[in-house]
Amino acid sequence: MRILTIILFLMLVPCFCLSQMKTGAFSDLETSQKGNPKPIIIHIYTDWCSVCKIEKYNLSKDKELIKKINEDFYFINFEAEKTKDKINFLGQEFNYLPNGNSGIHELALALSKNKSQPVYPLWIVLDKDKNLIYYHEGEFKPEKMKAKLLEISAL
């Protein structure tokens, strides 16, 4: 019985791993782009954003979308108010801007069209050369995201 339990466990573990979105970091982007250039998806969110949590749950259920993102894009999840690391991106250095007990990262402000207070969640898609090709504020429903990413992949 114990062996059967172990075998079943080992069979199920890959299923959970295969359905997860692969996320990267800005620090790895330059190396990744040199070896295998792909468009880049930057997802900017905060941990207090309820829309962000709903969106994350809905996206995690769409295995086809996760597969598309993992195969054809580099995906960066960026927590705008908790990320305190210095980030070099597009030839510039961006830092965390503390403001009392909280703060925001300069990169979130730089990528947002609303420079005073970004809207969360924020989705930015860059081409292989890091040019902006799509910008989306607010919830990005899986069906709309799939259609947009298919359109971008066809470019």
Predicted features along the sequence, with ranges:
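Structural recognition of the beta-strand scaffold that forms the well-ordered cores
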Residues: 40-43, 75-78, 122-125
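Thiol-based oxidoreductase modules, predominantly thioredoxin-like and allied folds used
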Residues: 22-23, 66-102
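A short, hydrophobic beta-strand/beta-hairpin element that forms part of a small beta-sheet core
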Residues: 106, 119-135
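N-terminal leader/targeting and pre-domain segments
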Residues: 20-36
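Short active-site neighborhood of thiol/selenol oxidoreductases, capturing the structured segment around
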Residues: 35-50
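Bacterial Sec-dependent N-terminal signal peptides
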Residues: 1-22
